[in-house]
Swiss-Prot record:
The gene is ornA. It comes from Emericella nidulans (strain FGSC A4 / ATCC 38163 / CBS 112.46 / NRRL 194 / M139). The record marks 155-156 as: Involved in the stabilization of negative charge on the oxyanion by the formation of the oxyanion hole. Substrate binds at residues 194, 223, 234, 321, 459, 464. The record marks 233-234 as: Cleavage. Belongs to the ArgJ family. Pfam families: ArgJ (PF01960). One of its GO terms (biological process) is ornithine biosynthetic process. Pathway: Amino-acid biosynthesis; L-arginine biosynthesis; L-ornithine and N-acetyl-L-glutamate from L-glutamate and N(2)-acetyl-L-ornithine (cyclic): step 1/1; Amino-acid biosynthesis; L-arginine biosynthesis; N(2)-acetyl-L-ornithine from L-glutamate: step 1/4. The active site is at residue 234. HAMAP family: ArgJ. This is Arginine biosynthesis bifunctional protein ArgJ, mitochondrial. InterPro entries: Arg_biosynth_ArgJ (IPR002813), ArgJ-like_dom_sf (IPR016117), ArgJ_beta_C (IPR042195).
Length: 464
């Protein structure tokens, strides 16, 4: 049950709406969504019952004169809620407020998520905390919740206060324009963007073993293009499902899924102050609640959520600031999963690896270098004499072997260059000696992008 297929063109109305900025806020230009990215924008979707969304223009950042920058996701009935947050010590005000609300409610009775883009509300002191809380309180007021029914997220420039009066004045409009249509979901996904070039939205249907004749729905939106590296980075995500899941099971499901999705991507190796991924489950589709990690429904739901979040998080990498490559690095035959992920992570954030890929240079020595200096792996994990490195082309043709059991291969540089012309590439690192697999079957996977000249331009201009 894969996420809904991504069509080859954006809806005409949506393309007209976003025309005007290629990299929102950082370097405004009069350009539509890049042609190469339009295929990732869905023209339809299957959305969870009982959820309504809206995207409203506030003008949080002065340079944004027309695009939606306030997103609201709400359920007509109380939800179970769970979230994972940034590990950055300077946690933004909305992160602190959302944590407090989840602790107070134990993940029960949450109805909404309110998100602004254009200002991170991070490192803003007591006033920033009050601003974040006032956003939650205002949404509660307009959705008929007594208190602690709304989670808050913000993204944008650090160290600046929100134009809170402007935001609060637009919440009535945000609530009155709530809708369950595909257009509304897409507009809402657009409202959380900053330097993104396209809105990131997925949806799918699924079934559970206990109710094989019942259809459930899940939808998710995310934002992020820079400052992306676990745990997590300047990355926001909201997932909604109409499956019935109790809060404790939902938190466990989310934590495990994020570890193999949003915490397995990297754009630039920086970890933000704001990242949050939250999930709401309202149970509107009916059926028996998932209330234990031991039942069949939980196991199936875990697989569904992990696969769904992997697809959603990969859209972030595909929109990496200035990126021209989408790279999968797969570490095979590791003695344990954590060691495999550490090696994959080190390769994914290596500037030398990333710039070589941008330059279409099959410089496998940089990959080996990153493998060799990886910290924290289990003793005996990396042994040069049994390490192999290959490129796996996106077109399904045979892998290009670069290093086999510590011995360099005669590399066809022309073929290597041709492989690196493609947008997609997989790097395979075998720690067990190629086909021998001496260490066993643990595998780690990371997704990352290259570094280009545009990345420097975008981030040099970010506050202008």
């Amino acid at each position: 049950m894969a996420p809904s297929a991504q069509p080859t063109a954006a809806m005409a109305t949506f393309t007209r709406m976003v025309k005007g900025q290629m990299r929102c806020y950082s370097a405004p230009v009069d350009a539509a969504i890049p042609a190469s990215k339009r295929k990732y924008i869905p023209t339809s979707g299957t959305y969870p019952k009982g959820f309504f969304v809206s995207g409203t223009h506030v003008g949080v950042k002065a340079s944004n004169t027309k695009f939606p920058d306030l997103a609201l996701i709400t359920s007509e009935t109380p939800c179970s809620a769970a979230a994972v947050f940034t590990t950055n010590k300077f946690q933004a005000a909305p992160v602190q407020v959302s944590k407090k609300i989840l602790n107070a409610t134990q993940g029960q009775g949450i109805r909404s998520v309110i998100i602004n883009s254009g200002c991170a509300n991070a490192v803003t002191g007591k006033g920033g905390l009050e601003d974040a809380m006032s956003m939650a309180t205002k949404v509660d007021e307009y959705t008929g919740v007594a208190e602690n029914g709304t989670l808050v997220m913000s993204t944008g420039v650090i160290g600046q206060r929100l134009p809170i009066s402007k935001i609060l004045s637009k919440i009535p409009e945000a609530t009155s324009s709530l809708s369950s249509t595909h257009d509304a979901w897409l507009t809402t996904a657009r409202a959380i963007c900053t330097t993104d070039t396209f809105p990131k939205l997925l949806s799918q249907t699924f079934t559970l073993p206990s109710s094989p004749g019942r259809t459930y729905n899940i939808a998710g939106m995310t934002k992020g293009a820079g400052m992306i590296h676990p745990n997590m980075a300047t990355l926001l995500g909201v997932i909604a499902t109409d499956a019935p899941i109790v809060p404790s099971a939902l938190q466990s499901l989310l934590k495990t899924s994020v570890a193999r999705s949003f915490n397995a991507i990297s754009v630039d190796g920086d970890t933000s102050t704001n990242d949050t991924v939250a999930i709401l489950a309202n149970g509107a589709a009916g059926g028996a609640p998932i209330n234990s990690t031991q039942n069949d429904d939980y196991v199936v739901m875990q697989n569904i959520l992990t696969s769904f979040l992997q697809s959603l998080s990969q859209l972030v990498v595909r929109d990496g600031e200035g990126a021209t490559k989408f790279v999968t690095v797969r570490i095979q035959n590791s003695p344990d999963y954590p060691s495999a992920q550490l090696i994959a992570s080190t390769i994914a954030r290596s500037p030398l690896v990333k710039t070589a890929l941008y330059g279409r240079d099959a410089n496998w020595g940089r990959i080996l270098c990153a493998i060799g200096y990886t910290q924290g792996v289990a003793p005996g994990t990396v042994v040069p004499e049994r390490t192999s490195v290959s490129f796996k082309p996106a077109d399904g043709s045979p892998v290009l072997k670069l290093l086999v059991n510590g011995e360099p291969e005669q590399v066809d540089e022309e073929r290597a260059s041709a492989i690196l012309q493609d947008e997609d590439l997989e790097i395979i690192v075998d720690l067990g000696g190629g086909e021998k697999g001496e260490l066993g079957g643990e595998e780690g996977v990371y997704w990352f992008c290259d570094f280009s000249h545009e990345y420097v331009t975008i981030n040099g201009d970010y506050r202008t």
